[in-house]
A protein has these predicted regions:
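Glycine-rich nucleotide phosphate-binding loop and flanking beta-alpha elements
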Residues: 16, 39, 97
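Dinucleotide-binding Rossmann-like beta1-alpha1 core, especially the glycine-rich loop
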Residues: 48-99
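A structure-centric signal for secondary-structure junctions around beta-strands
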Residues: 4, 27, 44, 85-86
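A secondary-structure boundary/capping signal
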Residues: 10, 34, 46, 85-87
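Beta1/beta-strand and adjacent pyrophosphate-binding region of the FAD-binding site
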Residues: 1-15, 31
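Accessory recognition modules or surfaces
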Residues: 2-4, 8, 40-46, 50
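Glycine-rich FAD pyrophosphate-binding loop
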Residues: 24-44
Length: 99
């Protein structure tokens, strides 16, 4: 597969996996190389939180896309993502943030 692929991605963290997924979705033949288990490095140690509201509209839209993708990824690929929709609570740490 490496010899026939025009795109080779090294690293199976969230960025490598996402890049491979989106390029393959566009019809490219992609080979992803990972020395261990997918997402088992730095990606695994991250909190995995996907908050949906930010102060910037573009980032909020990107996070919304991420939530939609995680909701359908397991069905599309047949691979378990471990995605769970949980709530969250943000507290104002001072009076200015409260306003």
């Amino acid at each position: 597969m490496i010899n026939s692929s025009k795109i080779i991605i090294i690293g199976g963290g969230i960025v490598g996996c996402s890049t491979a997924y989106h390029l393959a979705d566009l019809g490219h033949e992609v080979c992803l190389i990972e020395s261990g288990k997918l997402t088992s490095g730095s990606t695994w140690h991250a909190a995995g939180l996907v908050g949906q509201l930010r102060s910037n509209a573009n980032i909020t839209q990107l996070l919304g896309y991420s939530v939609d993708l995680y909701n359908r990824l397991e069905e599309e690929t047949g691979l378990s993502t471990g995605w769970k929709m949980n709530g969250g609570l943000r507290l104002a740490c001072n009076e200015q943030r409260w306003k």
